[in-house]
Regions:
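Tandem repeat scaffolds
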Residues: 1-193
Length: 193
């Protein structure tokens, strides 16, 4: 049996948790700065109202982890299986962060904010994203399938490819220049005269 930690209102600077286990640990209103969570076991860990600034979550094992009101700033997540996180009260926001090969399928991300982020090859299947904002976010190779994107804001997002036949996009906002990404599924040619 391992001892679990309970920390509240703490600042953790340059913590190297790579390859370690934080299984069952609880962190409330903590600020993590320049921390490394690469290949860290986060099973059952709880991060409630926490901020992650310049942190690395490459290949972190997130099964059963709770991110509740968590904010990621200038952080990196590679292979983040967010769909394996605890779903009750799951809420995250990202600013200036890089997310590669992450999976947000089946999650309720209503109102989530991705601001000045890079989301490459990420998956949003059967995801609730109504009212979400993808401000100044690069969505290269990201898949949206059978997701609710109603009232979502893609006005300053780039490189998205969203099939309107398999996603709800009513009242979503898109820029005229990037709206071509809504037509790719129809295999048509757009000519600029």
């Amino acid at each position: 049996m391992t001892d679990t930690k309970f920390l509240e209102d703490q600042q953790i600077l340059s913590g190297d948790f790579s390859g370690q286990s934080l299984e069952g640990d609880t962190y409330i209103k903590c600020q993590f700065k320049n921390c490394n969570f690469s290949d860290t076991l986060l099973r059952g860990a709880k991060f409630i109202s926490c901020t992650f600034n310049s942190c690395n979550f490459s290949l972190a094992k997130m099964e059963g982890c709770r991110f509740q009101d968590a904010t990621f700033i200038d952080s990196k997540v590679v292979g983040g299986a967010f769909f394996k996180c605890e779903r009750i009260l799951f809420s995250v926001n990202f600013r200036g962060s890089t997310l590669l090969y992450c999976n947000f399928s089946e999650l309720n991300l209503k109102g989530v904010h991705f601001k000045r982020c890079t989301l490459k090859e990420c998956h949003f299947s059967n995801t609730q994203l109504s009212g979400a904002s993808f401000e100044e976010t690069d969505l290269s190779g990201t898949l949206f399938h059978n997701s609710d994107l109603s009232n979502a804001n893609f006005a300053s997002a780039t490189h998205y490819n969203i099939d309107p036949r398999t996603n709800k996009i009513k009242h979503a906002k898109f820029s005229l220049l990037e709206a071509v990404g809504l037509l790719q599924a129809f295999e048509i040619t757009i000519v600029d005269l």
